[in-house]
Design a protein with these regions (language model features):
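Solvent-exposed coil/turn segments that connect beta secondary-structure elements
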Residues: 48, 89-92, 119-121, 156-158, ...
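Metzincin-family zinc-dependent endopeptidase catalytic domain
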Residues: 53-137, 141
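Catalytic Zn2+-binding segment of zinc metalloproteases
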Residues: 138-152
């Protein structure tokens, strides 16, 4: 079993256990603050050991941008000040993906750290699996929590759908409504959503 997890600050760590739900539920984790005001999120990849190809990172972000459309991802050459920092290692842990969303004092995301292990229990993961894990972790970086059904945001990689669904896109728009929806009409200040879960009903593409 390969697991991808999300780390929350203490104030965001208490979520309802989804295992008892009869519905297809997707959690909303967090909301971007002023870093998203220009509609651009920067990212930097720390892979000094060259454990993955550049194509893995590029395609993972392209998968989100092609479906979301309202956020531009810009790669930077410097880790300092980047919005999303991605690090690869070969530690061989069972948990191959972990995202830590760092929040400011008002509860908004100010930066994200994604750590990916290219090994699971000493076995090298296939490149397609690494890409799937990274795509899942980018979902966390965009404000998604976990789901209790077979889709991309399921915490167990073996149960994940490789396709980003409309429900996941709707949840990101809800999480970052102040910028990705309301800001299209007039400038808005960052605002946290009231809803913390989305009922996906069925896995719609």
């Amino acid at each position: 079993m390969i697991v991808a997890i999300l780390s929350y600050p203490d104030s965001f760590s208490v979520f309802k256990d989804l295992s008892s739900e009869n519905q297809n539920i997707l959690q909303i984790c967090c909301t971007w603050g002023k870093s998203l005001e220009d509609g651009v999120l920067t990212f930097h990849t720390n892979d000094s050991q060259h454990l993955v190809t550049d194509n893995v990172v590029k395609k993972s972000f392209e998968q989100w941008s092609s479906k979301l459309g309202k956020v531009n991802f810009l790669e930077t050459q410097n880790a300092s000040g980047t919005d999303v920092l991605i690090s690869f290692n070969d530690k061989g842990k069972q948990t191959v993906g972990q995202t830590t969303n760092v929040l400011n004092d008002k509860g908004f995301i100010k930066r994200v750290n994604i750590r990916i292990s290219v090994n699971s229990s000493e076995v090298k993961l296939a490149e397609d699996t690494i890409k799937l894990v990274l795509t899942h972790e980018i979902g966390h970086a965009l404000g998604l929590g976990h789901s209790n059904f077979h889709d991309l945001m399921n915490p167990i990689v073996n149960y994940q759908n490789k396709v980003i669904t409309n429900c996941e896109i709707d949840a990101i728009l809800l999480a970052n409504n102040w910028k990705l929806v309301e800001n299209l009409q007039q400038p808005k200040k960052p605002e946290l959503p009231i809803e913390k879960t989305v009922d996906c009903k069925s896995e719609q593409m």
